[in-house]
C-alpha cells in the first residue's frame, strides 16, 4: 500500500482544481497545467483535495499510485509558486549572458553556445557566473537545467564547468611525479 498515495492532495489557496475523468487541471496565479493519469488510477475531487486511488489491485496500478499523486501535487505547486533551478559557472573565461530570450554561454569552445529555452521557461542571468532557470512545470525546469549543464559539466580536477548551485563536486588529486 502506497504511503504517499493514501493522502489526498490538498488544493492550495489561490488554485482552482478540476477533475475530468483521468485529467486533472490546475489554474493558479502563475498559469495553468494539467496531468493525465493512467487508466489504472482513479481520481476524485473532494472537499479536502484530490484523492488518488488505484482502479484495481494489480501491481502495475499500485506502482503508479504514489507517482500520480506526486505529479498532481507538483502541478499545484507549479501554478501557485513555480519552480526554479540555479546553476553556477566556474572556470577562467567561462560566462553566461542573455541575448534576447536566448542564453549565450562562453564555455571554452571555439564558438559561443546559444541555448534557446522552450516555451514556458524563463532564464535569468543575475551575474555572468550564475544562471536561474524558472517556470511552472517542474519536469521542464529540471530538463532545461540539465541540458545547460550538459554543455560543459563540472570536471573533477579543477571543478571547471557548469554545475547546480547545491551540487558538490568530488575532487580528484592530480598525477604525482
UniProtKB/Swiss-Prot annotation:
<protein>
    <recommendedName>
        <fullName>Large ribosomal subunit protein uL6</fullName>
    </recommendedName>
</protein>
<dbReference type="GO" id="GO:0019843">
    <property type="term" value="F:rRNA binding"/>
</dbReference>
<comment type="function">
    <text>This protein binds to the 23S rRNA, and is important in its secondary structure. It is located near the subunit interface in the base of the L7/L12 stalk, and near the tRNA binding site of the peptidyltransferase center.</text>
</comment>
<dbReference type="InterPro" id="IPR000702">
    <property type="entry name" value="Ribosomal_uL6-like"/>
</dbReference>
<dbReference type="GO" id="GO:0022625">
    <property type="term" value="C:cytosolic large ribosomal subunit"/>
</dbReference>
<dbReference type="GO" id="GO:0002181">
    <property type="term" value="P:cytoplasmic translation"/>
</dbReference>
<dbReference type="InterPro" id="IPR036789">
    <property type="entry name" value="Ribosomal_uL6-like_a/b-dom_sf"/>
</dbReference>
<keyword id="KW-0694">RNA-binding</keyword>
<dbReference type="InterPro" id="IPR020040">
    <property type="entry name" value="Ribosomal_uL6_a/b-dom"/>
</dbReference>
<dbReference type="InterPro" id="IPR002358">
    <property type="entry name" value="Ribosomal_uL6_CS"/>
</dbReference>
<keyword id="KW-0689">Ribosomal protein</keyword>
<dbReference type="Pfam" id="PF00347">
    <property type="entry name" value="Ribosomal_L6"/>
</dbReference>
<comment type="similarity">
    <text>Belongs to the universal ribosomal protein uL6 family.</text>
</comment>
<keyword id="KW-0687">Ribonucleoprotein</keyword>
<dbReference type="InterPro" id="IPR019906">
    <property type="entry name" value="Ribosomal_uL6_bac-type"/>
</dbReference>
<comment type="subunit">
    <text>Part of the 50S ribosomal subunit.</text>
</comment>
<dbReference type="GO" id="GO:0003735">
    <property type="term" value="F:structural constituent of ribosome"/>
</dbReference>
<keyword id="KW-0699">rRNA-binding</keyword>
